[in-house]
Every structure is written in C-alpha cells, then in structure tokens.
C-alpha cells in the first residue's frame, strides 16, 4: 500500500519504519498516518533521538493495533468520543504541552481502543479492548500500576438489567492517555471513565467517589480535597453554577502518587466567573498579572472584543445554519488525598469559536513569546501545518479541539489538544492514479 501525502518527511520515522514488520493493512494505514504524526511532534519538540525511537516503537506495537479497521469512507464505522465535539470519530488525538520556562514541550496521545467486540451487543460500553490494553501496559511498562483503576472502575459501571435500557446507554465508557515526556524513560498512562447512567453522575461527589477512594486508599483516607469540591459546588455562588459531566480521569501509577481528576462545565462565560473558578473563590490566589494574561488569551481565543467588561457574558455565537451555538467552559479539579485543596485547570474550546484554527494557534504562540513562557512555541505551528493543510487551518474548523490552561510556578501552563481528522479528510483531497480516485492517505 502506497501513501500520497503532503506531510514533510521525518528521517527518524523513515529509519524506524524500514525494518518494522509490515503488519496487516489496517496497521500499515494507521502507522503511516499516526506514526508519522507522532514522529513530527517529537522531532519538533526536541526529543532526544533514542527517546523518539523508543516512543515510536511503543506507538507502533502498543497503540496502532488498537485503532481498528482503516477508514473505507468519510463516515466512521464506530464514532469514538476521542477529541470531543470537534473530532470526526477517529479513535486517536494528540496533545502538545508547551511547557514552561524551565520545562520543554512534551506530547501525549489519547485513544479509545477498538477491538473485535467493539460496536456489538457483546460489548455495548466498549470496555473489553480498553481493559485488555491497560492490562497489557501493566505487564510491559514497569511504572504502570492499575490498583486504583481496577478499584474505581466497578463503581462507574451501570447496573442495568433491561436490554432496552442498555441499548440506549451504549457508547464509550473508557479512554486511555499515554504521556511521553522527553526527559523520562517511562510512558505514563492515564485512564478516563465515563458513567453512562445520568443518576451516576449526580451521585459522583456524594457516593461514588468517596466509596471508591475508601476502597482504594483505606477507610481512613483523607477526603478534604474531594469534600472541598462538593462544598464549592453546592455553597459557593460561583461554584454552584458548575455541572458535573461524570468524566473522571485517574493516573495508572503507584497508589500514593495517583491523582483523580473530576471534570465539570459551566455555561457562565464571563471572565469574572472563570477567574472565580480558577481561584476556587479566592482560596487559591493567582496574581493579577496572570489573571490579566488569562483574560487576554480567553478573549482572543473566543473572538471577544478586548473592551468587553469582565462581568459580561461572551457574545452568542451563530452557526452557519443561523442556529445558536451554546458556549460551555470545561474545568477539572485534581483530587489527591494528600492535598487540602484541589488543583484547577480550565479548557478553552476553540472548535466552536469564530476564530480560525490558525488564528487561535498563532494567538497562543504570540502569547507565549510575549511572556517568555514555553520553549520554542513556533515548533507547535510546524506540527499543525504538517498534519493539517494551512488552507484548512485558515478556513475550516475541527483540527483544534481545546487549549487547557493551568497555573504552574507563576506561569500559565498551556496545552493544545488537536485531531488528525482522518475521516473528515479522507475524501477531502483526492488524486488521480491510473484513472482511479484515491484518498491522499492511500
């Protein structure tokens, strides 16, 4: 199978590929697309060459086989929830963490493993392939420990007997993230759980998580940070506007180092509200300078006028069909038994913003350069332009999903989440070969 692509050659990818077993046609396809993407990301981020080889081999043998059949049309046979609403159903997306002044960029990927039982009545929640992959990681990656995950996971499973109810709730319930730092010899694994039953989400803070944490850490576990989130969301005038999504992330590492991430959303888009959540109602101070940086970035990525008062909501956005595009703002709270207060991270959804993907990316890079944060942020632009044609970045949406923002050591720590758009672009660019129409990926 040949590939016709506009992506720039990455020598280390070509060298690694030269001696790899070809695998089946599906694996060849996903490796030549996503393997090249990963190689470009690591090259631009300045990973040591031996680390690039190590991570590429991990990707080829421990990620690619889980991506399922190659596309045969622009409609996915199973629409993965990786990448959220911006994505096209592809079972993988990527992130680029820009780093801070003393930490260089590093990359991650997020996948929903697909297996023989995916999209069948035998596995309506698509759990089998994911759990098998996590078990494999625990056998092959010395740093991976699944004690917390195996303890938490049963608490998130729906207890449903009626077939009709299960059919209504079928869909993704687990995702996996793999973080590959340039300065490490390990690959850090994260699992993300999605309760499918609405009543489970409402019980998350009061029943499910307290019991899961006691089961994992012992009856005397300190729940201060979890209880703080519950109190903040029920008693604080800003916090009570938050809504639980049910999504929960957990580190697959030694129990004492495991973090539990609880995801929430708000529909209040005023910057004063965003700042109140980031500071936990003033309990976690952030300097006025950093709040000013966050405000400027928030307005620019959302296409809001700079003079908009911080107490005002963002202008309502209109879709091409003239319907209203509701804006939600996701956050997560990072819960750890040893912490009294949770850490907070905000997510800026650019997939629904009036700002083009390229303009959003340029805005973030300019911000980092202006404030001396991150290391070589323009390398990120090289990655985006290599994965997605510049014209598409200028005129279409969907390549970029979110930017996340946290505060680390008096700097904004920014991460970009973006999509390969394998299905969306499958027939977008076609070439003639021997009189036949073929995708650029073939």
UniProtKB/Swiss-Prot annotation:
Presence of keyword Iron-sulfur: no
A Pfam family that the UniProt record links to this protein: Trp_DMAT
Domain of life: Eukaryota
Pathway: Secondary metabolite biosynthesis
Any one GO molecular function term: prenyltransferase activity
GO BP, sorted A to Z: alkaloid metabolic process
Endpoints of the signal sequence: none
Keywords tagged on the record: Transferase
E.C. no: 2.5.1.-
Described purpose of this protein according to its UniProt entry: Prenyltransferase; part of the gene cluster that mediates the biosynthesis of neosartoricin B, a prenylated anthracenone that probably exhibits T-cell antiproliferative activity, suggestive of a physiological role as an immunosuppressive agent. The non-reducing polyketide synthase nscA probably synthesizes and cyclizes the decaketide backbone. The hydrolase nscB then mediates the product release through hydrolysis followed by spontaneous decarboxylation. The prenyltransferase nscD catalyzes the addition of the dimethylallyl group to the aromatic C5.
Family as reported in the entry's similarity comment: Belongs to the tryptophan dimethylallyltransferase family.
Protein name: Prenyltransferase nscD
Species assigned in the record: Trichophyton verrucosum (strain HKI 0517)
């Amino acid at each position: 199978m040949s590939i016709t692509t506009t992506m720039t050659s990455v020598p280390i990818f070509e060298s690694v590929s030269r001696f790899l077993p070809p695998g089946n046609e599906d694996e060849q396809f996903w490796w030549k697309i996503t393997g090249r993407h990963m190689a470009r990301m690591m090259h631009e981020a300045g990973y040591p060459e031996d680390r690039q080889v190590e991570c590429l081999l991990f990707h080829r043998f421990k990620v690619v086989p889980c991506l399922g059949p190659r596309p045969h049309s622009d409609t996915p046979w199973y629409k993965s929830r990786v990448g959220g609403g911006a994505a096209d159903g592809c079972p993988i997306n990527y992130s680029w963490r820009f780093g801070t002044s003393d930490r260089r960029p590093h990359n991650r990927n997020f996948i929903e493993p697909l297996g023989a039982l995916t999209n069948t009545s035998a596995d309506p929640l698509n759990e089998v392939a994911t759990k098998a992959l996590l078990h494999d990681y625990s056998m092959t990656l010395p740093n991976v420990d699944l004690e917390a995950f195996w303890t938490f996971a049963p608490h998130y499973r729906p207890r449903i007997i009626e077939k009709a109810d299960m059919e209504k709730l079928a869909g993704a319930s687990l995702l996996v993230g793999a973080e590959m730092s340039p300065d490490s010899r390990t690959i850090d694994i994260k699992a993300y759980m999605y309760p499918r039953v609405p009543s489970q989400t409402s019980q998350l803070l009061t029943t499910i998580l307290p019991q899961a944490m006691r089961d994992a850490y012992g009856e005397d576990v300190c729940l201060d940070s979890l209880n703080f989130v519950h109190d903040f969301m029920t008693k604080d005038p800003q916090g009570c506007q938050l809504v639980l999504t049910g999504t929960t992330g957990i580190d697959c590492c030694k129990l004492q180092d495991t973090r539990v991430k609880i995801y929430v959303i708000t529909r209040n888009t005023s910057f004063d509200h965003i700042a109140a959540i980031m500071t936990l109602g003033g309990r976690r101070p952030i300097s006025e300078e950093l709040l000013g940086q966050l405000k400027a970035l928030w307005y620019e990525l959302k296409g809001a006028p700079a003079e908009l008062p911080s107490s005002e909501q963002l202008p309502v956005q209109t879709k091409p069909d003239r319907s209203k595009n509701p804006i939600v703002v996701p956050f997560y709270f990072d819960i750890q038994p040893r912490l009294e207060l949770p850490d907070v991270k905000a997510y800026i959804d650019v997939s629904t913003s009036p700002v083009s993907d390229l303009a959003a990316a340029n805005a973030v890079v300019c911000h980092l350069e202006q404030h001396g944060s991150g290391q070589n942020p323009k390398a990120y632009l090289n990655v985006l332009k290599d994965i997605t044609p510049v014209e598409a970045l200028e005129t279409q949406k969907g390549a970029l999903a979110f930017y996340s923002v946290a505060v680390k050591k008096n700097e904004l720590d920014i991460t970009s989440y973006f999509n390969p758009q394998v299905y969306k672009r499958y027939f977008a660019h076609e070439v003639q070969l021997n009189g036949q129409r073929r995708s650029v990926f073939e």
